[in-house]
Amino acid sequence: MGGTELDEMYFQSLSIAEVKLIRPRKFGDCRGYFSEVFREKWFRKNVADVGLVQDNESLSAQIGTVRGLHFQLEPFAQGKLVRCTRGALFDVAVDVRVGSPTYGKWVSAELSQENGAQLWVPAGFAHGFMTLKADTVISYKVTAPYSAEHDRGLKWDDPAIGINWPKMTTYVLSEKDSSQPSLCELPVSFQYVKV
């Protein structure tokens, strides 16, 4: 889990090496701060050599809102570069690549406006998050546009995966996210390819 510092950004692989945590540096003074949050050349060299084609943003008004776990099938499989621009969230990636040594395993990171951290979730992983503060805004760049036909999901609280979600009094989910299949019910969506 060693990290590398290059220019104004620091990144580290998490316990699933393909998932990366990126921490852009902040330069502050009496006016506030400046932070470079994305540079394509740096990203392609150090994180993933992919193009990011769309930028999305969502607001979750209530604490304990769960969105996910989501992924898309080929040819619209999405890698996601996720950041929190207001509030805070518990962000999760689950490996859904059949044959992977980390299939069904998960990693997480807390992303917040304060820490400025970003999570790279490659294609072949389901992604989801839970808000830790009210009025949390998440922004994420993706490698492929949304396709309803290729949109899939995974049960957020599947005991076979065992995500250690933060404890909340109430969880807020959409009907769609409440009825996603468990890992054992999931058809083969991605095959692991060792490189």
Curated annotation (Swiss-Prot):
Substrate binds at R31, E36, Q54, D55, N56, R67, K80, H127, D151, K176. GO terms for molecular function: dTDP-4-dehydrorhamnose 3,5-epimerase activity. GO terms for cellular component: cytosol. One of its GO terms (biological process) is dTDP-rhamnose biosynthetic process. It is an enzyme of class 5 (isomerase). This is dTDP-4-dehydrorhamnose 3,5-epimerase. Homodimer. It comes from the Bacteria. The active site is at H70, Y140. It catalyses: dTDP-4-dehydro-6-deoxy-alpha-D-glucose = dTDP-4-dehydro-beta-L-rhamnose. Keywords: Carbohydrate metabolism, Isomerase, Plasmid. Catalyzes the epimerization of the C3' and C5'positions of dTDP-6-deoxy-D-xylo-4-hexulose, forming dTDP-6-deoxy-L-lyxo-4-hexulose. InterPro entries: RmlC-like, RmlC-like_jellyroll, RmlC_Cupin_sf. The record marks Y146 as: Participates in a stacking interaction with the thymidine ring of dTDP-4-oxo-6-deoxyglucose. Pathway: Carbohydrate biosynthesis; dTDP-L-rhamnose biosynthesis. It comes from Sinorhizobium fredii (strain NBRC 101917 / NGR234). Signal peptide: none annotated. Its EC number is 5.1.3.13. Belongs to the dTDP-4-dehydrorhamnose 3,5-epimerase family.
